[in-house]
Each structure stands twice: as C-alpha cells, then as structure tokens.
Amino acid sequence: MSVNPASVTNPPAQFPEDFVFGGATAAYQVEGETRTHGKGKVAWDDFLEAQGRFSPDPASDFYNQYPVDLELCEELGINGIRLSIAWSRIFPNGTGEINAEGVQFYHDLFAECHKHHVEPFVTLHHFDTPLPLFEKGDFLNRETIDAFVDFATFCFKEYADQVTYWFTFNEIWADASNTYIEGTFPGGVKAHLAEAFQCEHNMMLAHARAVLAFHNGGFKGKIGVIQSLEFKYPLNENDPADIKAANNEHVLQNQFLLDATFRGDYAPDTLECANRLAAISGGTIEILDEDLEIMREAALYNDYLGVNNYQCRFLKAYDGENDLHHNGTGEKGTGRWRVKGIGEHVNKPGIPTTDWDWIIYPEGLFDLLVYIKQRYPNYKQIFITENGMGYKDPYKDGFVDDQPRIDYIEQHLRWLLKAMEVGVNVGGYFLWSLQDQFSWTNGYNKRYGFFYVDFETQKRTPKASAYWYKHVAQTRRLD
C-alpha cells in the first residue's frame, strides 16, 4: 500500500449529500413463496429439502410484507434498498415461457419503493439460477450465458421506467467458491480450483455481454457488478511462503475478477497465478479470444462497482491435504479453510472474530478500497453493497439491543470515510441486511438485519442499530 492509514487523521466530518444510506436484501433469502405464484424451481429448493435443516419458506415473507419494510425504511431514513429479481419468477424454466404474475410482482415492488422515496438498486442474479439451467452445468455451460443475457435484456426493457441502478451479478466469487471449493452450495464440489476459475470467467463474460446489451440498447440508468472482496494479509509479512499464500487467494478471489471487470482481460501476473492454481486440481481455464474482445469493450461501460466486504483474511502457507469445514452453526472456532497449494486461513492474535469465525478488522476495508483505486484508475465509483455483522440478537421486552453491530458498522464507516479522504469515490453504503433473513448455510439463527423479524408472526421490530443508523443518515456524520 502506498497510503499509510495512520496518516489519515482527519476523515471528512460529513458524508456527501447524495450519499446513499441503504439496506440490502436478496430474493431467495427474503421473499418466501418459493414454489408459488408461477415461480420455477432453483437448485436450492431440493438441496435444502434434502438437508432438512431449514426451509426458505416463508423466510421474511417479503413477497407479502414488502410494504411494511419499505414504510419502515422511510421512517428510519433508509433511502436505498438492494433488491434482486428472481430469474425463475420471471422465466420459470430460465428461458421461454414468461410468468406474468412474477413480472407484475416486481412492478408493484418497485412502485412501492418509489412511493416511500427508497431508491431500488436491482441485481439480476443472486445465487439463484433456474433449475433447468443449473442441471445443464450452470455457468460452466455457455448456454446459461446466452439465457442470462436474454433475461437481463428483458428486465432492462420491462422495468426501464422504474429502475435506474442495475447490477448484473451478486458475488461471483462466492458463487464459484461455495459451489466448487467449499462445497456448501448445490453441487457440493470441493477444492476444484479449475472449475471455480472457469465459473468466474464465464460469469464475467455474461456480465460483459449484459453490460453491452444495456449500453447498446440505449437504456437510461447505470449498470455494474457486485464482487465479494476481502483484503489478504500474510500472517508473517516477512515470510515469502506466507506472502505467496496471501497472493494466491488474492488472485483467486479479488484480482482475477477485478481484472475482468476493469481491464476486460487478465494481466500476466494474474493469469500466471490462475493457471498455476487451476493445474493443482488437474484442470485448465478456457478463455477464448472472442471472450476478451467482448470483455474489453464492456469494461468501458461499468458505471460503478459494488463491493461486498465483511472481513479480511490472514493466510499462512499450507501444502497438506484439503481440509474445509464451514461454520454454519455459530459455534466459535469450528471453521477451517486449508486448501492445498493456496494456503490456510488463520486468526491473528489480538484481532476479534464473530461466533461464525469472521474477522473484525475494519482497516481491511480501507486497504481494499485504496488497492482498487490504485490498480484500476479507470474505476468510476464504488458502492459498499454489503457490510454487516451476523449476531445472535437478544430480543427482550420488545427491544433488541445490538450494540456489537452498531460498533461494527461505526468502525467500518469511519474507515470508509478515511478511504474517501484519500480520493476513493464511494457513493453509498448498504447494510446487510435490511431485515433478518434466511441464510443459505446458516438458516435463521444468524441475524444481520436492522429489523428484527419474528419468523413465527413476521412482525418487524427495529433494533437499536436501526435508530442509530437513522441518526447517521439524517445528520450525515459520525459523532
């Protein structure tokens, strides 16, 4: 890093007047009604049913409760909301037949957003490829790219008068890693690095084609992609092996995707590392010349980057057998991530973690944002599209005192302001999540929301963090 954060002593006292203070959602995690109203199946439906641990129905019942949530947004000064359109609610089979009821649902939802002066920021894919396409290989099959571009183009046309801010994908890294490395998503493949890289590349090609469809179609508004990014630190900054481990995962999660976003191709150092890692699992990455032509053109038209960031990582060298265990229960200390040829996730003494073993180190957000600004000077704007803390929120006497979440958000916003002082252009911040939601791998005991949800009654209760956030949004400053 060429910027010393210790030298940034006077972050701006105020957020800009046009800064968005938002909350984030995802269709499958909030809507419920996963098999009704004409919606087609996704791989998660059968995957979760077979596990028998928890159900995505009714989740937060957002399909029916969205007027309540949006009214609360208006009352609490939340002026932006991240939403996703469930692809299979529009195209039940991914292509072909259109579900008119699903199309109308999103018209009604966006209208309600504007009624309450809450700007919708809309994502087209949030881990929910329609089942028929998933069964053909998901984004490892290039037919899915074609289908996604058709779906995206339909949405651009259909909702042109209601949606200004679009994102193509949510967290391409998480989709690839959870499906092909950690094995916690449908498919359940573990430690296949070549497939993870191929998934990342193909989804970035789909992003590029959708961006060009948006640009060439003359649609008003803006478009970008959301990447899940974490700054990687070597556990021992003086150990070449630890430095290499940190760089390995940095390329896998961050640099490969950011090169594709802002360069439209892959720098030599990126490609060398990616090919070396892919070979560990006995595979290669197919990158066609025509892919790069499309991606280079699209790189000119990214209006912003969405950054989902919850933590950083400390890595040390590891060359043993793959050992991956996801902490999906909140039993602290049970998570393990050791991948042969990449490295091992470790905790650094003195740095706190959550019950789900997530590192709390807000300075990592600063380092990440400055890295993006320095390596990709052609970036235009960044939105923090997810940041937040999973917590076992205690509900007592009609109130939720979630002071640890307030502390977490405040610390991250302070480091965000420091990044803005050194010239990073950030347009807004979205807490994950607006309300308590269904979690893909944790169910319902890991709560993130501003609004506490009683999942039996669907009653919403704003937490202490919601009132704190209202004050920040109204004053546009941190006290």
Locate each region found by the language model:
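Active-site region of glycoside hydrolase catalytic domains
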Residues: 2-50, 74, 93-95, 103-479
